[in-house]
Amino acid sequence: MENQRRHIHYDGDKDKEFVLNSFRKCITEKREIDKFLEKLITPYIKTKDLKILDACCGIGYISYFLSELSSNSTFFGVDQTPYLIEEAKKLCSNKKNISFEVADIYDLPSRFPKKFDVSISWRTLSWLPYYDQMIKDLIAVTKDHIFLSSLFYDGDIDFEIKVREFQKETGKEHFNDYYNVYSFPRFQRFVYELGAKNIEAYDFEINTDLPKPQIDQMGSYTVKLEDGKRLQISGAVILTWKIIRIDL
């Protein structure tokens, strides 16, 4: 459990420019899944005065966009990677209702018990060794609602998927990422056992075409099916996204 609690996603400054450029694209080319979050979360935050946690916030682009929808709320973003928080502070330097801190989500319950009205964990769970401690800690710091996105399977099977990108600095030394797909029924049972009152799940189906990246690089692209729908794929992994709202 301690290894899981102290899982370090990025290895120092290795692949720093690649990581930063990937995040910056979320600002210049807003992703469809991020637009979907805005649609789902708007009724819960618009024109309200809330304390909102952006857990594992990266460069803070989710807070950057959502602060426009809820200008009276305060946003607090945390990430364990210093250069991402540095970039987040630059991005949101003109937004007085957003603050950032280098911190580990697993240390927050002791500092902020039931402090936040709403918490967001965006595109994080599938890139952890497992989700259980993360969910426990999000519930511990949240009063009302948690919004998250992850890869889920509708059957009672978990898939642990490790990725090693040999063209990256970290991939030269070891497996550098997870792309886990979790059993949604098991996830539901787990969250209800922690005291959640309600769970709503929304399948994300992309409506735009995404080009395939270089063959040696993970990255989302789409394949159009005969019925007009699109599969999202990264490497050899089908991205079965769900957006989850947990009501506490």
Please report, for each region that a protein language model flagged, where it lies by residue.
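A short SAM/SAH-binding and catalytic strip from SAM-dependent methyltransferases
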Residues: 118-130
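Conserved glycine-rich SAM-binding loop
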Residues: 58
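Class I SAM-dependent methyltransferase SAM/SAH-binding core
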Residues: 61-107
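Acceptor-substrate binding/catalytic loop of class I
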Residues: 169-186
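Conserved class I S-adenosyl-L-methionine
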Residues: 1-46, 147-171
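A short glycine-rich, Lys/Arg-flanked "PGG" loop and its adjoining helix->strand segment in the class I
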Residues: 132-144
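A C-terminal cap/extension of S-adenosyl-L-methionine-dependent methyltransferases
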Residues: 200-248
